[in-house]
A protein has these predicted regions:
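Glycine-rich phosphate/adenosyl-contacting loop at the front of the ribokinase-like
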Residues: 1-43, 50-57, 61, 78, ...
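Generic secondary-structure signature for well-ordered alpha-helical cores
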Residues: 2, 6, 35, 64, ...
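Conserved phosphate-binding/catalytic region of the ribokinase-like
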Residues: 14-15, 181-251
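Active-site-adjacent beta-strand anchor residues
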Residues: 23, 41-45, 172-173, 193-194
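Short, conserved phosphate/pyrophosphate- and ester-handling motifs at nucleotide-, phospho-/glycolipid
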Residues: 33, 175, 221
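Ribokinase/PfkB-type carbohydrate-kinase core domain
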Residues: 57-70, 82-205
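Short acidic/glycine-enriched loop/turn segments that link adjacent beta-strands
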Residues: 73-76
Length: 251
């Protein structure tokens, strides 16, 4: 995470505060669920490199179980550029993460699972989409975060909507740009609309954001999702406020 103290200018130097740590959408949700008193397990593909070891050590600190292949290569890495106003832009190197195949998924990794939360990214890349769809078949309840309007655009909004409709998730988390490009909420699904500083809409119930001094918005939506899964709307907004008041996406 690079928190800029001044705007970037081409060819110039800008003061910044940097932090290296674990993150990623599914990883953030798992860490926040554990922080908020729930039990969490992360299932994903990582590499036997420094970034992978950092991520696995972070999960251990939070009490999150980790399952999934550990292979040669690069663990997924993201550079989050945080502007002076706390808004963020990301540059992502997915590494080995999208290479997680369905035949590598051990059904035992979902034993005891009462709820599966999928990152939308995992449904828009191959072969990880096969692993995600297989995991969804094994889970009794499913939620999906739409993840990124630009990823939906590149994948194809109609194609992505059809995939979601086939999955029939109990809950979908989206921001306004993602909702717009998808063409609106899915019928028969609990829809949580993340509205940043305006708060969130939980179905037909709209609540304001919890006041916070914004340092970094990276991971705020993931904290909100975790809070909602653990305790509902109020814990969701409280977790998001905690997240934006710190540098970094995990608790």
């Amino acid at each position: 995470i690079v928190r800029l103290s001044q705007p970037l200018a081409e060819g110039a130097d800008a003061d910044a505060v940097t932090r290296l740590g674990a993150g990623g959408q599914a990883a953030n949700v798992a860490a926040w669920v554990a922080e908020l008193g729930g039990e969490a397990r992360f299932v994903g593909k990582t590499a036997d490199d420094e970034a992978g070891r950092t991520a696995r050590a972070a999960f251990e600190r939070y009490g999150v179980e980790v399952r999934g292949p550990v292979v040669a290569g690069r663990t997924g890495t993201v550079v989050s550029l945080v502007g002076v106003d706390g808004g963020r832009t990301m540059a992502s190197d997915r590494g080995v993460s999208p290479d997680f195949r369905a035949d590598e998924l051990d059904p035992a990794w979902l034993d005891g699972c009462t709820h599966l939360h999928l990152s939308g990214y995992s449904l828009m890349r191959s072969p990880i989409d096969g692993a995600a769809l297989r995991a969804a078949e094994l889970a009794p309840r499913l939620s999906v975060d739409l993840s990124s309007w630009s990823a939906i655009r590149d994948f194809g909004p109609e194609r992505f909507r059809e995939r979601l409709e086939a999955l029939r998730p109990a809950i979908v988390f989206a921001n306004e740009d993602e909702e717009r490009i998808l063409g609106g909420p899915l019928a028969g699904t609990e829809w949580v609309l993340k509205r940043g500083p305006l708060g969130a809409r939980f179905g037909d119930r709209e609540l304001p954001a919890v006041a916070a001094d914004v340092v970094d918005t990276t991971g705020a939506g993931d904290a909100l999702a975790a809070g909602y899964l653990v305790g509902g709307p109020e814990p969701a907004l409280e977790a998001a406020a905690r997240c934006v008041a710190q540098l970094g996406s995990m608790p």
